[in-house]
């Protein structure tokens, strides 16, 4: 059995947003999930998040905003060059300049917009719009 914590987080956020919840608890907490939530917060897809400390790694309490139309995980985790990001942008996002693709780069986890500004590529993780 393969377990994908990122997929669990994205699906939990998507499902909670669709039924109109304002807050959701996500666990277990990890540094990668925290950085992905930070990118989503920077682009106002979530209002805020905080870590709830527990003995088994902790959880995140995420306050949702009403701006998420859809989100999902990109599998397989494709490596892309900076020049090819636009191709995946048109594949996963409904329109240009609408939504973000989250990727991991040598400079950390960021949106495709930041990666293009820095001129770097990376591995695609998820999309949100």
From Swiss-Prot:
One of the primary rRNA binding proteins, it binds directly to 16S rRNA central domain where it helps coordinate assembly of the platform of the 30S subunit. It comes from the Archaea. GO terms for cellular component: ribonucleoprotein complex; ribosome. This is Small ribosomal subunit protein uS8. GO terms for molecular function: rRNA binding; structural constituent of ribosome. Belongs to the universal ribosomal protein uS8 family. GO terms for biological process: translation. Part of the 30S ribosomal subunit. Keywords: Ribonucleoprotein, Ribosomal protein, RNA-binding, rRNA-binding. PANTHER family: 40S RIBOSOMAL PROTEIN S15A. SUPFAM superfamilies: Ribosomal protein S8. HAMAP family: Ribosomal_uS8_A (MF_01302_A).
């Amino acid at each position: 059995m393969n377990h994908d914590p990122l997929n669990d987080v994205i699906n939990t956020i998507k499902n909670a947003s669709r039924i109109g919840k304002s807050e959701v608890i996500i666990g277990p907490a990890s540094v990668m999930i925290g950085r992905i939530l930070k990118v989503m917060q920077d682009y106002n897809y979530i209002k805020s998040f905080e870590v709830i400390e527990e003995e088994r790694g902790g959880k995140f309490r995420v306050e949702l905003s009403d701006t998420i139309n859809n989100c999902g995980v990109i599998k397989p985790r494709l490596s892309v060059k900076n020049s090819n990001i636009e191709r995946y942008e048109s594949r996963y996002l409904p329109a240009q300049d609408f939504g973000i693709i989250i990727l991991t780069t040598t400079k950390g986890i960021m949106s495709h917009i930041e990666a293009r500004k820095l001129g770097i590529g990376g591995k695609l993780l998820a999309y949100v719009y």
